[in-house]
Amino acid sequence: MKMILLCGGGGKRLWPISNNVHSKQFAQLFDDGNGNYRSMLEHAISEIREIDPNVQVTIAAGRVQTEEVRSQLGFDVSLTEEPSRRNTFPAISLAASYLKDHDHVDPQEPIVIFSVDSYADRSFYESLFSLGEILDDGKTNLVLMGIEPTSPSDKYGYIIPASSDEVSEVRAFREKPDTETAKKYIEEHHALWNAGVFACRLEYLLRRADIVFGSSSYANLIQRYPELKKISFDYAVVEKEPNIAVKRYNGTWTDAGTWTGMSDLLNDKDIGQVVRDDQCENTLIVNHLDFPILAMGVKNLVVAASRDGILVAEKDRIPDLKTVVDEVWLEPRVIGKRYGGKEVLHRSESSETSLLTIRAGSSVTIKTDIGVRKTLTVLHGAGEKMKPGTIFTIQDGEKWQINADTDIELIETMIEFEIEPENY
């Protein structure tokens, strides 16, 4: 069995902790029990590796998110880079064609696909490994995982199974209903939340790509990717497939892709430098800045702060965040890099000051364009010709390689200047 994990997305639902580069899958909000925080992606990979260290995992992410993936996972997983955002079916088709043409995976191999925008315990990931077995019945082309509802919710689509058995044929799908209709689905039809988890054979995905895009060749799809039809996997595949089964899951699972879900999941635990009085109620505060947030007497709020902005919202207004955030959507200031990370401290029309973090053992080349000068000041750590207090300047058009012996933090100041005509 192989797995494809979808990690694209624009990051608006968890703004300002996420952005279009550092999307929600990369937001490190979950305590690992050792005082460190990890992301949904890191949690998913950790759980999968605990069950089967050798299973092949392919991450499908946008090209702008490649550095984020490598920053958190290194080179331990395969990665397909989407040149642009074209919805889930193009992303899955590209990953499937990569498995065929690059990794030479057997067309009959079961493939499990899911989006990394939920948080679940070990039993959920163990269930993923059993989905491929259902395909062996000779009649099922596609298997879904349905979540046993904990309440009638209008946040999810619903799967209507043919029975209440652990594995059942799928009778119908229903888009997000109101809570009364959802209650009826659950009571009368044993309905399940649609978790966006699919399993099928590789050749099935390739056939669907051929039908929709006229090709299942990786070289062809990557070349044409920006022009491929924007279409979801649900619309391109699920709604058109008559032979679908669903496996029922009744363990811990939470949609962590919104502040509403995150607030429930974190139980309104504070993250970062936060001080609150005992009159605060039902309020989640997440602070990724290096100065404190003081909260007094606030109720039913989500407060989140990062270099990208500050959110203060009543919880019942959180569903509107994705549309409202466009008014303050700026170039990201927090960016993961394969060597560590970059945090923009100050930005103006002609200058930018950033904190760079470089992991021990990493090597990075700092470049400058014509008309740009950079000054680097080492704050912590050591490397070749570097120690705390070292200052060096990179003139325009030059480059400097940093080899980190230990973890290094440094301040990078970039200044643009006008070029005299004789210097062209």
Roles of regions detected by a PLM:
Residues 6-7, 60, 113-115, 144-148, ...:
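Short beta-strand segments
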Residues 2-5, 15-20, 30-113, 119-125, ...:
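Conserved N-terminal catalytic core of the sugar/cofactor nucleotidyltransferase
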